[in-house]
Amino acid sequence: MSLSIPGLEYCRFRQTSRALRRILSFSTTTSPCFADRSTEGMSKRREHPPLPGKQQDIWPPSLSGMEQPVPSFKSFIRKTPPPTGSPGEKPLPPLPTLHRESVDTTPSAAINTSPTRTPSVPFWKAPANWDDSSTPVQEHQAPPVFSPRNYALLLPEASPGGLDSNEPTQWPFDVAATHHPRLNSIDEQVDQVSLSSACHLSAASASRSSSPRPDDDPSTLSSNSNNDRLVINTTKLYSTSSESSASHNMSPVSPSEVMFSPSNVSTKQKVFGIELPGGPGTTIEDWSSRTPSNPRSETPKSGLSMQGKKLQRLNRPISTIDPHPSDPDISAKAQHLDASLDYHSVLAGVYHEEHAHDARPTAARQKNKVPPSTRINPGKQRSGNREMVPRPLSWRKDSNSSFPNSALVDIEEDPKRVPNSRKRYRKMTNWVPFHQPMHMHKGVSQRVEETGSNNGSRYPKRKGKDSPESGGVHGKEADGKSLMPHVRDFATHVKNGIVSTSHAANRSITSSPSQPSTASTPPRAEQHTRLIRLGGGFALVRQSPAVTPPSHSSSRLDISLPLQAPVSRSYGQIPDIEVEPVSRRPSSLYSQQSEAPVAPGISVNKRNLRISPSLSPQTRSNTSSPPTSPLAHEVSFPRTPPPPARSPNRPPYRPQKGAEVVEDERVDSANEDKSHKKSLHVGIMDMARDARHAWKKHHQDAKHEKLKQSIRVLGPTDPGVAAAGVLVHLTPKAFIHHSSLLNTRTMRTLTIPAAVVKRKQACNSCRHRKRKCDAERPVCGLCRRWGIACEYNVPAAERGNPATGTAQPLQAPTRVPVLPGINVDAREAFPDAQTIGLDLDFTSAESGFGYPALQSISQSRNAPNDQDPIASFQLPNHDLLVEMVTLFFDNLYHLFPCFHRKEFMKQLEEGTIQKESTLILFSMCCLAARVHPDAAVKKRQQEWYEQAKFSYQLTQRDPYPALRTIQAALLLIAHASTAGDFSSSWLFLGKVWRQAVALGINRMDTRNAASMGIKPQHWNSGHEQVYGLDKKEGRNAVEKEEYRRTLWLLLVMDRNHAWPTGWPNALPISHFKVDLPIADSLFQEMTPEVQDAPSSNVPFVRNFSCLLGSLSSVTNPAVNVFQYICVAYVLLGQVSEVVHTLQDEVDTLEYLQACEELDSQIVKLRLSLPRKATSILEASPEDRGHVVWLQVMLNSCAMLLYYRCVKDESPKDDATNTFLHAVTAAQNVAQV
């Protein structure tokens, strides 16, 4: 859309009038002409036709009264007399001599101008170039009214220490000559080059010559010649990567020649600078691919140098103002924007008026030999290390009437650099409070790399995520919301490719090999830094102690300058900025890190701006750059001295050529990264991660130590088997966690370390209470604190070595006691295991028998006792094991008639039990050791019991094999109750009952269990529905009978624990549906091939009278005494419940009735017993033990019932005294 002359002049004059109106309204001298709205110039402006589509002016309340045009500048000057002086007024600064810039006019870049009207105010130049003799000077004929009035065209730089003070203050840093340079010079002219191309001109060209680059395309320069746009050519732009028009400041008092070029973006994007210079469609990738050119080039073609990158033109044409816009919203948006700009221009004017008389010290002027009237170009005085301080009320405009989208970043080489310097300074930034001073922080470091050669060779570039070859910036890396989440609508601009970044993915400028570098600029004592002001009171500050060589990692923000030394190898250094997106946290981020040195009033973000060494071969890439804000302002102040170098000295760099240079630099940089990594300051997240790793390592070490002290090795000795194996002794917690991994089929060799720390022996009190004992003698710390006796067991060395006699655990091969499916490395699977001074190393191969061979078991010399720890916890050899099982069946079977002898011995000979369940073998051995004639075997009774007890503690809800596990539990309960370990027997009783319930054995003979989903038809469909078992168990008659006998023995054990102690019964009859077992003689004659029992089982019912009737109706000639024992225990359970109940009192009627009923049931049971069940002489030898057992239990029932009934009665009536019944029952037990 072309721009006509009336529309252009209208916008230009409107902006000029408003700016002057704001400045003069805030000046100390108020003229009456400001209130007069009926001047000649105002009337003339009202005659100008309004823009089409402009229906009405919408002004905010704060700007009411500003919608009317103001008189022209000339008419206002002619009619307004100079103000009278007042004592409190400040004089305005004198107007310096103006210079008229020559406009580069080319046929292709002609601008539509009006033949009847020409600009009345010439183009302005920056104060630093007013006295520059290089450009022709054209005297400006100002009206006479200008002589008494003083206007400053640019905002002077105030002292960085006094942000809130009107008077200049002394800067606290110890710098001899403190100088605050002026802003860059601004040359406004019309050119054929687009705004984006012109704004990308840089002073960091490698050659510093005026010849155009060979890779510049002239066709590209004139591609958009038909579009009229504003071109700002700066005398010197200090940009490192691609700093653009964000560095230009437009004077609020020289807008007469300004041509506004509003784009199609929204007003918010313009005001807040959320737009790249290339236009609304320019993305970060497009902006990063631009290469700044040499601003000193005579032709603007050098400004499009891409350094060999044949990239397409990224800037889009910027449409100019159309006096007749088709969109009515454009005019309203432009008015809103103009109002905002005028408001900030007023603020800038006030700021300028406050600091109008700041001047450099005379000593500094004399030292630098600069006349007071001479404006020094700040670009020539700046060094590569500056600091940026957010200045209040200092908004700047860019070339397309929007606020700058990036802060000016200037880098000049430091002429004081020493060649081959090895200083390293780490560049760190932080979120810190706005008021936090610089000297409160530490830890800045930056690398100094030796690079280059005499001809200034290029460094190889490494592809990154933001390079054109790799696809550019996408996804989360370009999400500016993570960097500046408090800016509204920022995510929308990111999606549209409009992100306010200036350093995101810019290419570094390196010196060309064909163009030698020129001499450097004179040194300056002050240093600078770059600041990006963010919303919410934060600012992003970049601080560079020195200049480093450019890094060609495209994933970082490379800020570089050409080397200025002509021939010398002054290897510079440049820090690389790696920007990482960090999510905003609810807590204050700046409180986490406070190690970065910052200047007063500077806020930095350590997480978002990280400095890493240049030329690093690391592949981390992040192209998200910190967003900018129109609040960003550039201020120069003395640099903070960097910390001393921390890196070790390296041999001098030897320049090479070609691929050798690349490889040498990568290796060298990698080595420096490794050596310098420890010196880098870690953040709160790194500290937390290190703490977590340390905790994990400590936990693993503790587990490993615990493993060494908690593994036991078990195994039987079998001289007939060449294989050997081990079983690891574990705690229940360890086995439950790792039981699925166990498989001793592939156990490996056991080895013991050369030195194992001797375990302290805990006292009996601490071991019983499961407390940690310090093993102090004669009294440990806990016993001393509790005031109890402290006793220690006698060491095993004093008891002698029990591993004698027939047992030879180490000389003979061993058979493996295994649990099925066990295959584990003890170090990994048993971190909670309890060792006996062993370090296990399972490395042996399997033997021919399918069991792992035990190749080496060495004992530590520091073992707590002299006996072999492995032999103490091994099963006996095969012969001894068969002997022990035979002793059990010969002497103890009548107490545990739940084993089918022939089937059990067959499995023992075949080794099936050794494979499936060593628990039952340990239990049998500990009981059979009581009747063994060998004293050495009897001494091992406790050891076998402890191992069986420990093995059962490892079982879970559904153990395998279920039958052998429950049988072993019965044996353990019996041994524990007779050996004095009542606590274990009581706990084991409850556990085994719950395991039986979980396996469904308690309802194996039920016909109806509706609550469990079992119906009568399920009985005929198969036992798996009744048992609820996943395994094929109880399929033949022998297994079924073993299950029945095992469950009835469990009920017997439960009643034996309940009636003497008064504890409740663990097995309720209501959930017990198992038929009475058949005669033992018939049971032992059964074979596994038989599917049905030779005799039917008597069903069990809860009604005791019905149960006695069922027993009397049996016509089997073989007397089944065990059936009567089971019925007697059912009766004993009922008596125990009535006597030990907590509900009824002794003198209540209900209690007396229950006792009378139980007494009658005892009498009925005695009368129903056959003669062979009551007389030992008439009973068969196999049943004599059961006869004695039955008589003892019947007398126990009578004694318990009668004693409770008569203990409170008077002994006077001996005839009716029931106490005699209790005494008689006790006498009968004694006689038996």
From Swiss-Prot:
<keyword id="KW-0238">DNA-binding</keyword>
<feature type="compositionally biased region" description="Low complexity">
    <location>
        <begin position="194"/>
        <end position="212"/>
    </location>
</feature>
<feature type="compositionally biased region" description="Polar residues">
    <location>
        <begin position="224"/>
        <end position="254"/>
    </location>
</feature>
<feature type="compositionally biased region" description="Low complexity">
    <location>
        <begin position="616"/>
        <end position="626"/>
    </location>
</feature>
<feature type="compositionally biased region" description="Basic and acidic residues">
    <location>
        <begin position="384"/>
        <end position="399"/>
    </location>
</feature>
<feature type="region of interest" description="Disordered">
    <location>
        <begin position="355"/>
        <end position="402"/>
    </location>
</feature>
<dbReference type="GO" id="GO:0003677">
    <property type="term" value="F:DNA binding"/>
</dbReference>
<feature type="compositionally biased region" description="Basic and acidic residues">
    <location>
        <begin position="474"/>
        <end position="484"/>
    </location>
</feature>
<comment type="function">
    <text>Transcription factor that likely regulates the expression of the gene cluster that mediates the biosynthesis of squalestatin S1 (SQS1, also known as zaragozic acid A), a lead compound for the treatment of hyper-cholesterolemia by targeting squalene synthase (SS).</text>
</comment>
<dbReference type="Pfam" id="PF00172">
    <property type="entry name" value="Zn_clus"/>
</dbReference>
<keyword id="KW-0804">Transcription</keyword>
<dbReference type="InterPro" id="IPR007219">
    <property type="entry name" value="Transcription_factor_dom_fun"/>
</dbReference>
<feature type="region of interest" description="Disordered">
    <location>
        <begin position="502"/>
        <end position="525"/>
    </location>
</feature>
<feature type="compositionally biased region" description="Low complexity">
    <location>
        <begin position="508"/>
        <end position="523"/>
    </location>
</feature>
<dbReference type="GO" id="GO:0000981">
    <property type="term" value="F:DNA-binding transcription factor activity, RNA polymerase II-specific"/>
</dbReference>
<feature type="compositionally biased region" description="Polar residues">
    <location>
        <begin position="285"/>
        <end position="305"/>
    </location>
</feature>
<feature type="compositionally biased region" description="Pro residues">
    <location>
        <begin position="80"/>
        <end position="94"/>
    </location>
</feature>
<keyword id="KW-0805">Transcription regulation</keyword>
<protein>
    <recommendedName>
        <fullName>Squalestatin S1 biosynthesis transcriptional activator L3</fullName>
    </recommendedName>
</protein>
<feature type="region of interest" description="Disordered">
    <location>
        <begin position="182"/>
        <end position="330"/>
    </location>
</feature>
<feature type="compositionally biased region" description="Polar residues">
    <location>
        <begin position="585"/>
        <end position="595"/>
    </location>
</feature>
<dbReference type="Pfam" id="PF04082">
    <property type="entry name" value="Fungal_trans"/>
</dbReference>
<dbReference type="GO" id="GO:0006351">
    <property type="term" value="P:DNA-templated transcription"/>
</dbReference>
<feature type="DNA-binding region" description="Zn(2)-C6 fungal-type">
    <location>
        <begin position="763"/>
        <end position="790"/>
    </location>
</feature>
<dbReference type="GO" id="GO:0005634">
    <property type="term" value="C:nucleus"/>
</dbReference>
<keyword id="KW-0479">Metal-binding</keyword>
<feature type="region of interest" description="Disordered">
    <location>
        <begin position="572"/>
        <end position="682"/>
    </location>
</feature>
<feature type="region of interest" description="Disordered">
    <location>
        <begin position="33"/>
        <end position="94"/>
    </location>
</feature>
<feature type="compositionally biased region" description="Pro residues">
    <location>
        <begin position="639"/>
        <end position="654"/>
    </location>
</feature>
<dbReference type="InterPro" id="IPR001138">
    <property type="entry name" value="Zn2Cys6_DnaBD"/>
</dbReference>
<dbReference type="GO" id="GO:0008270">
    <property type="term" value="F:zinc ion binding"/>
</dbReference>
<feature type="region of interest" description="Disordered">
    <location>
        <begin position="438"/>
        <end position="484"/>
    </location>
</feature>
<keyword id="KW-0539">Nucleus</keyword>
<dbReference type="InterPro" id="IPR050815">
    <property type="entry name" value="TF_fung"/>
</dbReference>
<keyword id="KW-0862">Zinc</keyword>
<dbReference type="InterPro" id="IPR036864">
    <property type="entry name" value="Zn2-C6_fun-type_DNA-bd_sf"/>
</dbReference>
